[in-house]
Structure formats: structure tokens, C-alpha cells
């Protein structure tokens, strides 16, 4: 994937969600929930602080993260794959 996020931005590929209910019913449309987990594909250089220094991000490529998909999260198609571009502040946790 040929993309390099700027500053404190992170590129995440959403994880697939099981599309069956606990009872074995196949869920479609709005009943099928989207995952709020994904794999970090790329990270920016870091957040630029008021004094001009750069604070490195806490996440790295390959991390599995839980994110808050709200205002400011951008969906994009890169090389045929849908990815999310978001700020590190939209990440809530690193899994594992």
C-alpha cells in the first residue's frame, strides 16, 4: 500500500466481523455490525507540539487497535482496499 499519513494520523484496515448471530442466523445490511477493531497499516511521524518538537505515536504498524469511529474519521479506498484515516486520539486501545 503506497500511502504515508501525516503528523498524528494513522491508517487502519478494519477487521472482518462474524456475520452470523449466536443462533446461526446470517446477518445482512444494518443488522451486520461493523467492527471497531483493525490493524494499523501506516503511521505518521508524530504529533507536533506547541514548542515545535515532535512527539512520536504510541502505535506502530501491525498493532491491532480498537478505535472510535466518529467525526474526523475518513474512509478511503487505497489500492482497491477500504481503509480508515484517523488521528491517534481516535484510538482507544491496543489489543494484545
Curated annotation (Swiss-Prot):
Cite the Gene3D superfamilies for this sequence.
GroES chaperonin (2.30.33.40)
- Could you tell me where this protein is found in the cell? Cytoplasm
Q: Which GO terms describe its biological process?
A: chaperone cofactor-dependent protein refolding
Signal peptide positions are none
* Major subcellular location class: cytoplasm
Establish whether keyword Cytoplasm is in the entry.
yes
Similarity annotation? Belongs to the GroES chaperonin family.
Q: Which NCBIfam families does this UniProt record tie to the protein?
A: PRK00364.1-1 (NF001526), PRK00364.1-2 (NF001527), PRK00364.2-2 (NF001531)
Record's protein name? Co-chaperonin GroES
Q: Which organism is it from?
A: Shewanella piezotolerans (strain WP3 / JCM 13877)
Protein's gene: groES
Amino acid at each position: 500500500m503506497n500511502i504515508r499519513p501525516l503528523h498524528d494520523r494513522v491508517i487502519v484496515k478494519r477487521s472482518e466481523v462474524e456475520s452470523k448471530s449466536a443462533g446461526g442466523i446470517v446477518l445482512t445490511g444494518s443488522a451486520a455490525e461493523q467492527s471497531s477493531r483493525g490493524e494499523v497499516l501506516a503511521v505518521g511521524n508524530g504529533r507536533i507540539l506547541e514548542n515545535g518538537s515532535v512527539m512520536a505515536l504510541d502505535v506502530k504498524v501491525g498493532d491491532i487497535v480498537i478505535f472510535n469511529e466518529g467525526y474526523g474519521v475518513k474512509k478511503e479506498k487505497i489500492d482497491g482496499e477500504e481503509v480508515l484515516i484517523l488521528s491517534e486520539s481516535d484510538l482507544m486501545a491496543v489489543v494484545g
